[in-house]
Amino acid sequence: MEAIITKEFFEDKTTIELARDILGMRLVHQTDEGILSGLIVETEAYLGATDMAAHSFQNLRTKRTEVMFSSPGRIYMYQMHRQVLLNFITMPKGIPEAILIRAIEPDEQAKQQMVQNRHGKTGYELTNGPGKLTQALGLSMQDYGKTLFDSNIWLEEAKLPHLIEATNRIGVPNKGIATHFPLRFTVKGSPYISAQRKSRILTDIWK
């Protein structure tokens, strides 16, 4: 087992730095069916009070966003279009910033159960989107509020990307200048990136 990420990982880093630094880390969910896991290949940063695309824009505090005001490493789950999306809180208490996990590269030993969880979906479709990866990993709204440090969900050090690309976030139209913030980070060439073009897939993406 690789080194498990602790609270110290989140210290003295910005949300943007964290969104880049967790690329290549292994996201692990321990379930009744066994360990389900994969390498993170795509993230998006959401910068809280000043980010029109963030749920916590202008420090909006609701029952849904309450966990965003807690502490680094806390898990923020929310539903969108019948899908459940996974986010990690990044900043100290009271600063509601987060990272959305958009795609993972599934680990080989976990694929069989993940395919079952995805009702037979295989290949890149297994985990190449934020709602797809949570379904594959068996995550749900019941995971809201857990932490990465004392629950059945955690991060492990695994691989380092050769190159990281920064582009506009997906699905945030009509959010003023925030629509054009380059806050989506991807492992360049990964076939599991959402909406990845075949012509952009590379065979050697890890150091």
Swiss-Prot record:
Record keyword Glycoprotein present: no
EC number: 3.2.2.-
Disulfide bonds: none
Keyword list, A-Z: DNA damage, DNA repair, Hydrolase
UniProt-listed SUPFAM superfamilies: FMT C-terminal domain-like
Keyword Signal: no
Single Gene Ontology MF annotation: DNA binding
Pfam families: Pur_DNA_glyco (PF02245)
Enzymatic class: hydrolase
Matches recorded under InterPro entries: Formyl_transferase-like_C_sf (IPR011034), MPG (IPR003180), MPG_sf (IPR036995)
GO biological process terms on file: base-excision repair
Family the UniProt entry places it in: Belongs to the DNA glycosylase MPG family.
Annotated HAMAP family: 3MGH (MF_00527)
Family matches, as NCBIfam families: 3mg (TIGR00567), PRK00802.1-2 (NF002002)
Protein name per its UniProtKB record: Putative 3-methyladenine DNA glycosylase
